[in-house]
Design a protein with these regions (language model features):
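Bacterial N-terminal signal peptides that target proteins for export
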Residues: 2-14
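Sec/Tat signal peptide C-region and signal peptidase I cleavage site
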Residues: 22-28
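Extracytoplasmic "Venus flytrap"
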Residues: 31-54, 58, 63-80, 86-88, ...
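Hydrophobic alpha-helical segments within soluble ligand-binding/sensing domains
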Residues: 32, 74-76, 132-158, 200-202, ...
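Short, solvent-exposed amphipathic alpha-helices that sit
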Residues: 43-60, 140-144, 168-187, 200, ...
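Flexible loop/hinge segments that line or gate small-molecule binding clefts
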Residues: 61, 99-139, 150, 157, ...
Length: 323
């Protein structure tokens, strides 16, 4: 009887250990990686909020990797490869430079790990994404061109804060912007890339206003640059006289528009992009069909006239939220 009890206890302990091991494995299997060039600022914070908020609802643990800036491409590639080694269920990726990610994305595909673009329709220049949620960067450029023509119907001069050097999203926007203004009376008099930092953008915009005191419009690749341009116009007491045009409507961009120092914003919906991207991951992980492989999230032109009538919940994270 005593031996039987010991055997029963041993079997029970063994079963408990097996259950715990299975539970641990199940928990590990629920991890999803997120690889971003940066995790701070008016673009990355809301997209990460959308991902994180819906990931909790879907039962996933998110591992966020921050490369610390667009200049750290090698670091981002290394972080992505590390997520593959960790055998996460899927990876959400916004690549600093898609040309650098071909090998890493192939590595993920070989490991049967889906790679989904989050804020980027492209994950690697030669390897297709399993899915993506984004706005077309070329479409943003076209919409910015519409904005420039609306603000300067008779033509004028433009100084361009072009975005981070080497960032494909910024170059795509600017390329398509230039295509649309090529045969107009709009003339680009200055163009400069710079670090994606508000203080750097402000300094660059101030420099433009000093070098080109009669410039008609400042173009910002996104609202980090646009807010810098707006604050420069504000400091020079040129709000309204120098038009300010950019993409993405974060909190600071909204404030600068209310102050009359930003005139036209092509607003993206990064919270919605994040929610859509993690939803696509969930379907891929569960082997369910996607409605579309690429979900293009609509752009919303914003001026002071419609600023109060549009919902910001798909554009901005809750105040104080950080990744």
């Amino acid at each position: 009887m005593q031996e039987w009890s010991k055997g029963r206890i041993a079997r029970t302990a063994g079963c408990a250990a097996a259950i715990m091991l299975l539970a641990a494995n199940a928990q590990a299997a629920d991890k999803v990686g997120v690889s971003m060039p940066n995790i701070k600022g008016p673009w990355f914070t809301p997209i990460l909020f959308g991902i994180s908020d819906d990931a909790k609802k879907l039962g996933y643990e998110i591992i966020i990797q921050d490369a610390g800036g667009y200049g750290n491409v090698d670091k981002q590639v290394s972080q992505f490869s590390n997520l593959v080694v960790q055998q996460v269920k899927a990876i959400l990726l916004d690549p600093a430079n898609p040309d650098s990610f071909n090998g890493a994305v192939r590595q993920a595909k070989a490991a049967k790990i889906p790679v989904v673009g989050a804020g980027s329709p492209v994950v690697a220049s030669s390897v297709e994404a399993d899915a993506a949620a984004s706005s077309s960067h070329c479409s943003i450029g076209h919409e910015l061109a519409k904005g420039a023509k609306t603000l300067l119907p008779n033509g004028g001069t433009i100084a361009i804060l072009a975005g981070p050097p080497g960032a494909f999203w910024a170059s795509d926007r600017l390329r398509c912007f230039k295509e649309d203004i090529a045969n107009s009376n709009l003339k680009i008099v200055a163009e400069q890339t710079s670090e994606q930092d508000a203080a750097v953008a402000l300094s660059l915009a101030n420099d433009f206003l000093q070098r080109f005191p009669n410039v008609d419009l400042l173009y910002g690749a996104d609202d980090t640059y646009g807010v810098g341009a707006g604050r420069a116009a504000q400091g020079a007491q040129k709000c309204g006289k120098v038009k300010v045009l950019f993409a993405v409507l974060g909190e600071a961009a909204e404030e600068i528009m209310r102050a009359g120092c930003a005139d036209y914003v092509v607003a993206q919906q990064p919270v919605l992009i994040g929610r859509t991207a993690i939803g696509m991951v969930d379907k891929l992980v569960k082997g369910q069909p996607l409605a579309k492989k690429l979900e293009e999230i609509a752009l919303i032109p914003v001026t002071k006239a419609n600023l109060d009538s549009i919902s910001k919940t798909t554009m901005q994270a809750p105040k104080g939220w950080t990744p």
